Amino acid sequence: MQLYNKLSAEERARIIDENSQERITLSFYKYFNLGNPTLFRDHLFIVWSNIDVLGRIYVAHEGINAQLSVPKENIDKFKKSISEITPLNEIRLNIALEHYSKSFLKLTIKIRDKIVADGLNENTFDVTKIGEHLDAQRFNQMLDDKNTICIDMRNHYESEIGFFKGAIKPDVDTFRESLEVIDRELEKNGKEKNYLMYCTGGIRCEKASAYLKHKGIKNVFQLEGGIIEYTRQVNENNLKNNFLGKNFVFDERRGERISDDIVSNCHQCGNPCDSHINCINESCHLLFIQCKDCREKMNSCCSNECMEIIKLSYDEQKSLRKGKHNSNKIFKKGRSPKLKFKIN
């Protein structure tokens, strides 16, 4: 039985284009006790491969975290495959606000120690004792309460392009660093405040709220379904939208437009912009914000150095990449030497 991708991303993209295939981008997560992650992973790969599901899925003893792209014509088959797994049979699917047929180009299901890399030792507190989930309307009400401390549980590059009004946006690279920010807020504001948290789809707030409960905080709240579900409820129920800008997403779209506000700037020229791009130089692949003008001037590169590298032959570029590991390279303003140049 084939348990890995037979097609490259480029081949898959071509097939999607040729078939004019309409696909739905969605995500879900679930914390539950999984005895055999390997068996579960292989089962999912077989079932989902047969209905052309693509995406990035993490499986661990603690559950599943999935971001997927499903052919519209197969969405009922996909839902049936989920319903046949007891812990997942009533799970909410976070449907993307904007659909892009090539949001994912491979089906990747990986076994991990955890479904979110949180750096926590769960033996020190009960992860099932979490905060109260709020829908969009109640979240808005809590956000307006002067006794509320709202914390964005995402990383700096996510909150840079979009956030809730009045939220604390930690300048962090990891979830574990966000918890250190929570500790500082507790020390500064005390335990009697309302602590309100949000993230993309809700998964990071689950453990963060359990962490706060462990710290002895009574008034702990989290946004049900994250920014994705919040926006759906706002649109369907004609509620006030308190989110400014884009919601960063971890697929080829890089973001969903929530409001018309542009709250960030091009990392090269400083003009208003909220479009992330990976440097086209494969030996770099830096994630940063680049406007249309700079993209044209810089040939989708992050630096003059990378512009020179992409002029080399394929073999020369491949030789430069040998032995280098470039995953998770993300620009952080003031910390990256790559972007210390000025476009005239």
What are these language model-derived features?
Residues I149-M153:
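Short hydrophobic beta-strand that contains or immediately precedes a catalytic carboxylate
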Residues D144-N147, K191-E192:
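Short, well-ordered loop/turn elements at secondary-structure boundaries
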Residues G131-D145:
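Internal catalytic-core helix/loop-beta-alpha segment
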Residues Q2-E132, N155-Y195, I203-N344:
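Rhodanese-like catalytic fold shared by cysteine-dependent sulfurtransferases
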